[in-house]
Amino acid sequence: MAQVNKQAIAAAFGRAASQYEQHASLQQHSADALLTLLTGRQFASVLDAGCGPGRMSRYWRERGSEVTALDLSLPMLQQARDRQAAHHYLLADIEAIPHDAEVFDLAWSNLAVQWCGDLRDALSELYRVVRPGGVVAFTTLCQGSLPELRQAWQAVDNRAHANSFLPEEAIDHALRGWRAFRHTQAMTLWFEDALSAMRSLKGIGATHLHEGRESDVLTRARLRQIQLAWPQRQGKYPLTYHLFMGVIERD
């Protein structure tokens, strides 16, 4: 797995904090999909790991759960606090949660663990802080995500402008030894042009590359090349994500 610079990731998401919600349709769709795997279940205490501006922290709070919101980015956590999304707030890393073991009934993490250095370590931490009989519920992105972005940039400079995500088999391997249910789903978002599609990534802070550079500055000439190379369908510009959902039952 590529070396992960947590400080750079936190900075990228911090810059996106103020406009995150208006670009977060993927996060909303993936959260809704994960919720369907928890239908009918209630949780007295919830950890929202990678809470962002707190949309799902607020969701669980409004359903009577005592919520702890955790994020690596201080501006994101401040957004959640300003919205009174949770009861408690933790500026922390999912791979090193500063909490006792067996505290929460649900550890919820929506599209955050793909930013961790080691998926098994991240899931092990979430598992550690959940009580026996509790649940770890998470989503992440897997290999094959953002093919349109990759195809368009390939026509320009043949360099990686998106992070590589783990194949399904590697995520399954990270779940070994636990009682887990998993499901995969493709999600496609549609945009009016290629620039809007790329802005959606920047708007959620997802422009940091693990290789250590931010996405290159777009010139008009480059943008024209990308626009022409982007695969279109009925005049729209798709951006496809391969979503992996996992639910781990804590023994």
UniProtKB/Swiss-Prot annotation:
GO terms for molecular function: carboxyl-O-methyltransferase activity; malonyl-CoA methyltransferase activity; methyltransferase activity; S-adenosylmethionine-dependent methyltransferase activity. Belongs to the methyltransferase superfamily. NCBIfam families: BioC (TIGR02072), PRK10258.1 (NF007610). It comes from Salmonella typhimurium (strain LT2 / SGSC1412 / ATCC 700720). Keywords: Biotin biosynthesis, Methyltransferase, S-adenosyl-L-methionine, Transferase. This is Malonyl-[acyl-carrier protein] O-methyltransferase. Converts the free carboxyl group of a malonyl-thioester to its methyl ester by transfer of a methyl group from S-adenosyl-L-methionine (SAM). It allows to synthesize pimeloyl-ACP via the fatty acid synthetic pathway. Its EC number is 2.1.1.197. GO terms for biological process: biotin biosynthetic process; methylation. The gene is bioC. The lineage of its organism: Bacteria, Pseudomonadati, Pseudomonadota, Gammaproteobacteria, Enterobacterales. Pfam families: Methyltransf_11. It catalyses: malonyl-[ACP] + S-adenosyl-L-methionine = malonyl-[ACP] methyl ester + S-adenosyl-L-homocysteine. Pathway: Cofactor biosynthesis; biotin biosynthesis. It is an enzyme of class 2 (transferase).
